[in-house]
Amino acid sequence: RYRKLGKHKASGLYYPTLHTLCVDIRSPSSFIHEYFHMIDDQLGDLSLEVSFNPITVLYKESFLRQMEQLSDAVKSTLNGKSKYNIQYFFRRAEIFARCGEIYFSRILKVESSLIKPDLAYAYPESEALDEAVKTYFEMLLTVRLPNYGLPEAV
């Protein structure tokens, strides 16, 4: 669903209980992120599977390594008690969705209004992470999705 999401203070939302993905019509760039939340949920919490562990570890390591170079204001937010602190970014479902975005934007080089990562630090640069993301998401989107009765996603 495309709609105005002003009161939610988010450009996109995924509601698992309603099986509904909502994207703010004024800012469609969160679509791919929310799409990967939906895939994660609909296919049985893929982000919690053992096969996703290496990506989780690489993401956190890369994030922490790059965090050292961030401004004090951003570090303060990440270390604070706001909704968008480091615990938020380290939730496995968030890592899954962000790595799905990495797959589309960095690996496949997709350029679209439906995918524009907004917080650069939330998408850490790492060759090892990119390679793990490439391997995992290629398998997911070309082999596993068709096995669930869904068409290939790429």
Locations of regions flagged by a protein language model:
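Active-site-flanking segments in enzyme catalytic domains
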Residues: 1-154
